[in-house]
Amino acid sequence: GLLVPENGVYRTVKLYAAKKADKFMGEVQVGQWSDWVYDNMLDDKGVKRPVAYKLRLFELAEDGSKLELYVSSACRLEADPNYTNPREIGQELLDHCGPIVNASNAGRPYAEIGQETWALNLDWCADAINYLLDNKPWDLFYCHLHAIDVANHNMLSDVVPESPRYERFYPLLVKYYENIDQVLGKLM
């Protein structure tokens, strides 16, 4: 990566494949998510596979002395045929809906990243559901999204007003419910 100063202040990180690469693969500014970064990674057998991931820049000191960067899990761009039924639908969903961000399980210190990755994940799920409902025959639609369940397990003890962490966690829990409302709105 490379820190890019603007008028002597660092606000942007650019990601390059190599130190002397001419073009950057992705960039991100403080407080933002990057667009998809397309890359290649070795799988467990040593085979190079195309993947996509996103960056989230939490902090970048104005003088460049401190950096806190989150890299999402990588989404393989070749669908695993064992993940979907029918098998061929996985690649079709990737082709029509793009890569998916898996929800982070980074824990309480990074609860905000958990909520943000769930929001990205749920947005993809809504797009995938709409694609399937519009383009495939179906008799029954059923969907189980775990975001609120996970959020309640992680935060429920801290969303009572007596909790010293209430001010941090209550707004996050509300965002999870808003994310599910947005999914429902996209499906209507």
Residues covered by each model-derived region:
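His/Asp/Glu-rich, glycine-adjacent segments
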Residues: 1-163
